[in-house]
């Protein structure tokens, strides 16, 4: 068992442009090596690109993409009687957010566009329309949970 106290969850401050906590969390996920200014430029640049290409409010498109990528169920390994089962469990809201943002960033990293701004904008627009790498990852995870529904009674 852990000897230390459980780390308290610090509230995320909303971003300066949209006053939105989710945008701030996304910027924090984009950030590498503490370069938050660069991460902010990438995100807001992608928002400008989304605005130009779709003609819609970028925050609305981002939220739509977020909701499309958000997983409902996932599988967790559970060892019972010498064998390991992949048990489907519902995903809590904090884990939903972290998985969604993580999948979106990893999908952005795998895209072919030249700049980070173009890659992020492309992934946000694709995810908002129900396609792209992050959506594929979500579908894979939910398909795995559906395939292992027989082990749902092992849930803890």
Swiss-Prot record:
GO biological process: ribosomal small subunit assembly; translation
Pfam families reported in the protein's UniProt record: Ribosomal_S7
Gene Ontology molecular function: mRNA binding; rRNA binding; structural constituent of ribosome; tRNA binding
GO cellular component, as recorded: cytosolic small ribosomal subunit; ribosome
Keyword set, alphabetical order: Ribonucleoprotein, Ribosomal protein, RNA-binding, rRNA-binding, tRNA-binding
NCBIfam families reported in the protein's UniProt record: rpsG_bact
Job description of the protein: One of the primary rRNA binding proteins, it binds directly to 16S rRNA where it nucleates assembly of the head domain of the 30S subunit. Is located at the subunit interface close to the decoding center, probably blocks exit of the E-site tRNA.
Subunit (UniProt): Part of the 30S ribosomal subunit. Contacts proteins S9 and S11.
HAMAP family according to UniProt: Ribosomal_uS7_B
Family: Belongs to the universal ribosomal protein uS7 family.
Stated name of the protein: Small ribosomal subunit protein uS7
Native source species: Deinococcus radiodurans (strain ATCC 13939 / DSM 20539 / JCM 16871 / CCUG 27074 / LMG 4051 / NBRC 15346 / NCIMB 9279 / VKM B-1422 / R1)
Gene label: rpsG
């Amino acid at each position: 068992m852990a000897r230390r106290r459980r780390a308290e969850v610090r509230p995320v401050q909303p971003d300066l442009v949209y006053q939105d906590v989710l945008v701030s969390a996304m910027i924090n996920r984009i950030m590498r090596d503490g370069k938050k200014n660069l991460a902010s430029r990438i995100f807001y640049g992608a928002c400008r690109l989304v605005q130009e290409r779709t003609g819609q409010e970028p925050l609305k498109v981002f939220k739509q993409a977020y909701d499309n990528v958000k997983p409902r169920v996932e599988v967790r390994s559970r060892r019972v009687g010498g064998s390991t089962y992949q048990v489907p469990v519902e995903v809590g809201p904090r884990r939903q957010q972290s998985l969604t943002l993580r999948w979106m960033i990893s999908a952005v990293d795998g895209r072919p566009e030249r700049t980070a701004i173009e890659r992020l904008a492309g992934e946000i627009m694709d995810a908002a329309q129900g396609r792209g790498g992050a959506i594929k990852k979500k579908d894979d995870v939910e398909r795995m949970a559906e395939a292992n529904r027989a082990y749902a009674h092992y849930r803890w």
